[in-house]
From Swiss-Prot:
Protein's organism: Octopus vulgaris
Catalytic reactions on record: 4 Fe(II)-[cytochrome c] + O2 + 8 H(+)(in) = 4 Fe(III)-[cytochrome c] + 2 H2O + 4 H(+)(out)
Protein role: Component of the cytochrome c oxidase, the last enzyme in the mitochondrial electron transport chain which drives oxidative phosphorylation. The respiratory chain contains 3 multisubunit complexes succinate dehydrogenase (complex II, CII), ubiquinol-cytochrome c oxidoreductase (cytochrome b-c1 complex, complex III, CIII) and cytochrome c oxidase (complex IV, CIV), that cooperate to transfer electrons derived from NADH and succinate to molecular oxygen, creating an electrochemical gradient over the inner membrane that drives transmembrane transport and the ATP synthase.
Mitochondrial matrix-side segments: 55-79, 144-160
Name of encoding gene: COI
Main location: mitochondrion
Single Gene Ontology MF annotation: metal ion binding
PROSITE patterns with a match to the protein in the record: COX1
Cofactors that this protein relies on: heme; Cu cation
Pfam families according to UniProt: COX1
Topology in membrane: Multi-pass membrane protein
Protein name per UniProt: Cytochrome c oxidase subunit 1
């Protein structure tokens, strides 16, 4: 998590440097897109989720509920160990070909590439699938723990605000993940089957993109 935080911060600094001056520093829009995309996923899935929710929350939430442990302790392990391969795939996607940035699909105004790049996009997509599965497992665990593992006197209105914040975050995460999964699947289909979900020249929708 700390390593991901440092990596994400360094990517953030590159973005700030690029945007904080007139003219271009990187001289490559695709590279900039790759950095923006990678920085977002690294920060969310590999810093905030495992450290603040996983590591910190796993210990603090049961403590605040008066519970001996999380509802499914082994599920937490599974959730965590999906993240290292996911991070590896994401970083590999940036190293292969010209990376997966905003120009994943054939949407010319946003990407310098007029054709899809192959393995890079697949690596990024499967990385996000793993991170998504990990998040779902964690969210189910937290929701179940907060609903079922409270001691008798701990009514919902007596829950500490930290526990409420984790509870609401987990619910919102479960609501938003199908949208992410749908978008990722459409990107995968769009690239591999030459459909036009996003490509405006083929009747697709740039807003959806």
């Amino acid at each position: 998590g700390i390593w991901s935080g440092l990596l994400g911060t360094s990517l953030s600094l590159m973005i700030r440097t690029e945007l904080g001056q007139p003219g271009s520093l990187l001289n490559d829009d695709q590279l900039y897109n790759v950095i923006v995309t990678a920085h977002a996923f690294v920060m969310i899935f590999f810093l905030v989720m495992p450290v603040m929710i996983g590591g910190f929350g796993n210990w603090l939430v049961p403590l605040m509920l008066g519970a001996p442990d999380m509802a499914f302790p082994r599920m937490n392990n599974m959730s965590f160990w999906l993240l290292p391969p996911s991070l590896t795939l994401l970083l590999s996607s940036a190293a292969v070909e010209s990376g997966a940035g905003t120009g994943w699909t054939v949407y010319p105004p946003l990407s310098s590439n007029l054709a899809h790049m192959g393995p890079s996009v697949d690596l990024a997509i499967f990385s996000l699938h793993l991170a998504g599965i990990s998040s779902i497992l964690g969210a189910i665990n937290f929701i179940t723990t907060i609903i079922n593992m409270r001691w008798e006197g701990m009514l919902m209105e007596r829950l500490p605000l930290f526990v409420w914040s984790v509870f609401i975050t987990a619910i919102l995460l479960l609501l938003s993940l199908p949208v992410l999964a749908g978008a990722i699947t459409m990107l995968l289909t769009d690239r591999n089957f030459n459909t036009t979900f996003f490509d405006p020249s083929g009747g697709g929708d740039p807003i959806l993109y």
